[in-house]
């Protein structure tokens, strides 16, 4: 177990499939903010922007950019994300499927319906997780 999370967080994840870990990536906020800003200005081939009917803020989605955006790569390989994921899943190792960035600007009226991510993954495994970093 990593010092960043406690046994209760692991138990919550194991029981409920989700848990909240506050502040575990605080040292990475600036790195990730710069990476996301770059990504928004320079979307990859799968990047998409959506604007609602009222023309408010945009909603942007993009993924699989960690090989071209150094901040994403730095976070993936140098943060405690893998250690945290392994602890939550009680796994000896983790493997990255992909990173996925969602940016919802203020005043956007594009809705995001409640959904489950698992059907979107072409992965069969007993232990998988998504780390959401707001």
Positions of PLM-derived features:
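Non-heme Fe(II)-dependent double-stranded beta-helix
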Residues: 1-114, 119-122
């Amino acid at each position: 177990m990593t010092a960043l999370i406690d046994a209760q967080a692991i138990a919550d994840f194991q029981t409920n499939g989700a848990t909240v870990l506050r502040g575990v990536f605080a040292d990475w906020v600036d790195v990730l903010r710069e990476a996301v800003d770059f990504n928004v200005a320079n979307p990859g081939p799968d990047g998409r922007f959506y604007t609602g009917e009222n023309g408010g803020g945009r909603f942007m989605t993009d993924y699989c950019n960690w090989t071209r955006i150094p901040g994403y790569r730095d976070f993936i390989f140098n943060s405690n994300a893998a250690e945290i994921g392994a602890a939550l899943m009680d796994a000896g190792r983790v493997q990255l499927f992909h990173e996925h960035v969602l940016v919802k600007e203020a005043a956007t009226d594009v809705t995001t319906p409640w959904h489950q991510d698992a059907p979107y993954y072409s992965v069969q495994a007993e232990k998988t997780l998504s780390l959401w970093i707001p």
